[in-house]
Amino acid sequence: MSFDIAKYPTLALVPDPDDLRLLPKESLPTLCDELRQYLLNSVSRSSGHFASGLGAVELTVALHYVYQTPFDSLIWDVGHQAYPHKILTGRRDRIATIRQKGGLHPFPWRDESEYDTLSVGHSSTSISAGLGMAVAAEREGLGRRTVCVIGDGAMTAGMAFEAMNHAGDIKADMLVVLNDNEMSISENVGALNNHLAQLLSGKLYASLREGGKKMLSGLPPIKELVKRTEEHLKGMVVPGTLFEELGFNYIGPVDGHDVQALVATLKNMRDLKGPQLLHIMTKKGKGYAPAEKDPISWHAVPKFDPASGTLPKSSGTLPTYSKIFGDWLCETAHNDDRLMGITPAMREGSGMVRFSREYPQQYFDVAIAEQHAVTFGAGLAIGGYHPVVAIYSSFLQRAYDQVIHDVAIQRLPVLFAIDRGGIVGADGQTHQGAFDLSFLRCIPNLVIMTPSDENECRQMLQTGYEYREGPSAVRYPRGTGTGAPLTPPQALPIGKGVLRRRGERIAILNFGSLLPQALEAAERLNASVADMRFVKPLDDALVRSLAEQHEYLVTLEENAVMGGAGSGVNELLMQLRLPRPVLNIGLQDSFVPQGSQEEIRRDLQLDADGILAQLEGWLAR
C-alpha cells in the first residue's frame, strides 16, 4: 500500500527531522494539516490506533522542530499517539504496515528506529525511564536533553508520580509534556495564556526566579511569602500547584494545536535547568469530526471509509468473551447488590459498558491503577462485598505483589476476570497474555480456571463468584467464542476436568481455548483429549488415569511453557512416580511478536496442523 506523496507537498520535504528543522516556522501549520490527512488516509486503509495520533500532530511537529532528535531523547508514554512521530522519522512509506505481521511495530520500539528511545506499550513508564536517561545525559556532559510525553490518563498511575517525586528531589534537567485531551480547550487556553506561558518559560523569568530564591535563602519568612505570592499569581490562571509541590516548574496550560506557540514555548524551555512540566490541551481525534465527537470508539479502528464517517459493524454473529463476561456480570448483579465490578480504565475493552450503565453504584473505574484495583477489591471483600476485578492479562503483571500480599495470603474471595489471555495479536510483545498461568500457578490459595468455550466461561465465572474460601481467576482469550449454546450459570466442581475424546496411546491434556485444535489433531492421531478446565487445583485423578492408560501425554496451552499448566502436570507425574514421556506444547521462551491471532498460531505451530507436526516430530525422535 503506497500513497502519492505529491499530494502532500510540504510533508514530502521532510523525510526525517533534520529536514523538518530546515522548514521556516511559517510553514509548520501547513505541514500539520498534511500530516493529519496522511495519518487519516493511512490508518483508514490499514487499521490501528487513530484518535490519539490525530490529537498529537502539532506537538509531534513542534518537538522534533525544537529538539535535536535523535541526539535529544524523546520518550512517548504508552505510544498510541506516536503514529505522527513514526511518519516524521523515516517510516512514512511503511506506516500502512503498522500492527501487521512483519510491519511497523504498533508502538515506539527501540529495535525499529534510533528515534524510538524507549520501547513502550504499557502506561506510565515514560517519566521513570526519562529520569534515568536525564541523569545519564547529565553525567555524559554532552548537552543531551530529555523530553517525556505523557497523557492525562497515564498520569493517573502512581508510577508517574513516583518518578516526578524523584525528579523533583534530585532536580534533574528534563521536560515532561502533559498532553491533556480529557477536556475541551478552556477559556484559559488562548492568546493570553499562551503569552503567559512564554513569559514564565523565558530565561529572564527563570533567572529572576532562581536569583530571588538565592537572595532570600537566608530570610525564610520572606522567601515563603514570595513563594506563596508566586503560587497565588500563577494559580489565578494555571492549575499547576500539585506539580510545583513535586518540584517541577509548571508552565501552561497552552493550546496544543497552535504549533507556532508550542515551538516558541518549547524553545524557551529547552535550556531551563531542573525538572519542567509543560501542560498542553489537545482534542483527541482533532481534524476528523467523527473522531472528535466520539474519541473512545475511534481510539483503535479497523479499516474504514473516511468519507462515510462511520466504523464498519462487526460481521461476526458470535459474542466475544468480553461480552460474555459483561452479560454474566449484569445477570449476577441483578440478583446480588453486593457484587462490585472493578476495572483499571478498561471499561470498553473488558465488556463493562452495559454494567456501568445499569449498575453504576456497583461499578468502579479506578483509572490506570492496577495495583490499587486489586487491593481495593481486597478491601471490599473484607467489608463483606463480592468484588470482581476485570483486567487484561498483560496488565495484571503490574499488580502481582497485590495479588499475593493483599489477596491470596489473606484468602480473600476476590474473583479475577482475566481478559486477553494467550495470543492477543496485533499489539505485539507488550500485550500478549503469555505469562499469567505461570506467574499465578505458584501462588497458594488461588483457584485458576481456563474455559475452552464461551459457555464454560460463564460456568467458571459463576464458580469463582460462589467460591468463598479464597481468590479465584478465570482466564479467557481475546476474540469470539465457538458458538457453544449458553446455559444458565452453574458452579462447577472445583478441580475437575472432563474427558472429551477417548483414543489410544496418546492423551492430549488441553488447558483453555485451544480445545478445537486439540480435537482436530486428535482425530488424525486417534488420541484421547481431556478438557482439564482447572490449572489449579489440577484434576489429579484424571491425570493419573490418563497416564496409566496411555503411552504418551501431551499438554496444550496458550501460555508460556515454562512454569505453565503443563509444568504442573509434569510435577504431579513426578510426585506420583508415574514416568511417562510428556510433550509440553505452548509458547516457547521468546516474546510473541505482532500479527493476527491466526498468523501467530500458525507460525508458533499452535493450530491443528502445527500441533500434529510437533507431536509427530517428537514421536519420531
Swiss-Prot record:
SUPFAM superfamilies: Thiamin diphosphate-binding fold (THDP-binding) (SSF52518), TK C-terminal domain-like (SSF52922). Its cofactor is Mg(2+); thiamine diphosphate. Thiamine diphosphate binds at H80, G121, H122, S123, G153, A154, N181, Y288, E370. One of its GO terms (molecular function) is thiamine pyrophosphate binding. It is an enzyme of class 2 (transferase). Keywords: Isoprene biosynthesis, Magnesium, Metal-binding, Thiamine biosynthesis, Thiamine pyrophosphate, Transferase. Binds 1 Mg(2+) ion per subunit. Binds 1 thiamine pyrophosphate per subunit. HAMAP family: DXP_synth. This is 1-deoxy-D-xylulose-5-phosphate synthase. The gene is dxs.
